[in-house]
């Protein structure tokens, strides 16, 4: 996710000069500063801060997790004080792991009344952002300290202690498949530098980050296309989405058909041919059809049909 203070400066920017950002539909539901999406049981989980103001370090205890499925929204994890600023999520062996400020909170999906467990990270590692798992090890990115931690979760009831695993500039979104980790880099201080790119780590036992995509940005969410031939990456500056071909390395801007500009695309996910893009400051989730056709006139741009899940926010700061 991006950090407080940046959202409003980006609101007037468009993705690319020829983008046509128009809203095709708005569905009002129950979201409040949604940062992350995650496929779950035929639907999508959405993590919300629920706070009075947009603050990724808030300690208000108003965070909650919604479950969107078949056009309906229900509450999976209520705002009961267990979460404050929930971000990246992971479901493994009947447990839901959720990033929060300086910690990871673990909920049992089988025993909903059970108290959640807390895995604390070392002091100062505040912006715990995203999670992936491989062979019983959980990997957690911390954007403000340039670290990715690893811990053993083979026994969910007795998780290991988080250990520093590798250093990557501003690690934000994580994506892991077949032992290869992809990392979206975001500048914690808001100042984009050459090393804020998309990285790949091909060997988890001997981690060595390599630049996969050279263009710097404020990258947040990262997800595979349904055919696993490309990556979708969200960017806060300029606000939008790009598609990176994993075979050629070519990056293509995706043209979203929106009327209200995308402001803060956070932790995206792909499920059943649709891309879910949480627009954090606007408290909404864009649902984008993944089927794209290359525009002959442009040669490099794609157009996406889309509709909006603009979840009800009574104090929407950008309304």
Short names for language-model regions:
Residues 30, 45-59, 96-103, 140-146, ...:
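Conserved beta-strand positions in repeat-built beta-propeller and related beta-rich domains
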């Amino acid at each position: 996710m991006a950090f407080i203070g940046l959202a409003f400066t980006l609101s007037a920017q468009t993705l690319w000069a020829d983008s046509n950002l128009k809203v095709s539909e708005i569905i009002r539901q129950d979201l409040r500063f949604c940062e992350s999406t995650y496929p779950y049981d035929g639907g999508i989980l959405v993590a919300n801060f629920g706070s009075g103001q947009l603050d990724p370090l808030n300690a208000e205890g108003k965070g909650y997790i919604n479950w969107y499925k078949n056009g309906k929204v229900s509450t999976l994890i209520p705002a009961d004080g267990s979460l404050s600023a929930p971000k990246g999520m992971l479901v493994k062996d009947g447990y839901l792991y959720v990033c929060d400020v300086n910690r990871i909170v673990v909920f049992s999906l089988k025993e909903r009344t059970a108290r959640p467990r807390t895995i604390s990270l070392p002091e100062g590692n505040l912006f715990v952002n995203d999670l992936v798992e491989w062979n019983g090890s959980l990997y957690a990115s911390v954007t403000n300290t340039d670290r990715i931690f690893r811990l053993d979760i083979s026994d969910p009831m007795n998780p290991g202690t988080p250990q520093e695993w590798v250093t990557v500039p501003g690690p934000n979104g994580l994506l892991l498949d077949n032992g290869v980790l992809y990392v979206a880099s975001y500048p914690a201080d808001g100042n984009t530098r050459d090393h804020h790119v998309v990285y790949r780590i091909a060997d988890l036992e001997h981690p060595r980050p390599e630049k996969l995509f050279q263009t710097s940005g404020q990258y947040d969410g990262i997800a595979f296309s349904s055919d696993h031939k490309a990556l979708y990456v969200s960017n806060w500056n300029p606000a939008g989405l790009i598609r990176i071909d994993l075979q050629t390395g070519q990056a293509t801007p995706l043209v979203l058909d929106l009327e209200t500009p995308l402001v803060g695309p956070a932790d995206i996910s792909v499920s059943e041919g649709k891309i879910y893009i949480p627009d954090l400051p606007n408290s909404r989730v864009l649902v984008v059809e993944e089927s794209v056709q290359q525009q002959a006139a442009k040669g490099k741009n794609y157009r996406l049909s889309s509709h909006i899940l603009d979840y009800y926010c009574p104090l929407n700061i950008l309304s």
